[in-house]
């Protein structure tokens, strides 16, 4: 899967979960600062990422994901 395909899937997921316009989602979007995501929102988002991409994201790694771009890079580097 290409970086663009990963980004598009993540952006669609965020748009649906947080009810924001898909066009406003960029790689620089910060989960906590821009989305006001609390810890439950973030855990649910990580679970969605795991389900969508078939990857297991350990808690230590998940805590380091601050932006959409970081999530894209993580998924890209951990693809099967």
UniProtKB/Swiss-Prot annotation:
4'-phosphopantetheine is transferred from CoA to a specific serine of apo-ACP by AcpS. This modification is essential for activity because fatty acids are bound in thioester linkage to the sulfhydryl of the prosthetic group. Transmembrane segments: none annotated. This is Acyl carrier protein. The lineage of its organism: Bacteria, Bacillati, Bacillota, Bacilli, Lactobacillales. Pathway: Lipid metabolism; fatty acid biosynthesis. Residues 1-79 form the Carrier domain. It is found in: Cytoplasm. Carrier of the growing fatty acid chain in fatty acid biosynthesis. Signal peptide: none annotated. PANTHER family: ACYL CARRIER PROTEIN, CARRIER DOMAIN-CONTAINING PROTEIN. It comes from Lactobacillus johnsonii (strain CNCM I-12250 / La1 / NCC 533). InterPro entries: ACP, ACP-like_sf, PP-bd_ACP. Disulfide bonds: none annotated. GO terms for biological process: lipid A biosynthetic process. The gene is acpP. It holds the Pfam family PP-binding. One of its GO terms (cellular component) is membrane. SUPFAM superfamilies: ACP-like (SSF47336). Its main location: cytoplasm. Keywords: Cytoplasm, Fatty acid biosynthesis, Fatty acid metabolism, Lipid biosynthesis, Lipid metabolism, Phosphopantetheine, Phosphoprotein. The modification O-(pantetheine 4'-phosphoryl)serine is found at residue 39. HAMAP family: Acyl_carrier (MF_01217). Gene3D superfamilies: ACP-like. Belongs to the acyl carrier protein (ACP) family. GO terms for molecular function: acyl binding; acyl carrier activity.
């Amino acid at each position: 899967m290409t970086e663009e395909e990963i980004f598009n899937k993540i952006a669609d997921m965020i748009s649906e979960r947080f009810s924001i316009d898909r066009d406003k989602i960029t790689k620089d979007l910060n989960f906590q600062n821009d989305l006001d995501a609390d810890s439950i929102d973030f855990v649910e988002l990580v679970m969605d990422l795991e389900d969508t991409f078939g990857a297991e994201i350990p808690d230590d790694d998940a805590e380091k994901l601050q932006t959409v771009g970081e999530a894209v890079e993580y998924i890209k580097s951990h693809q099967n």
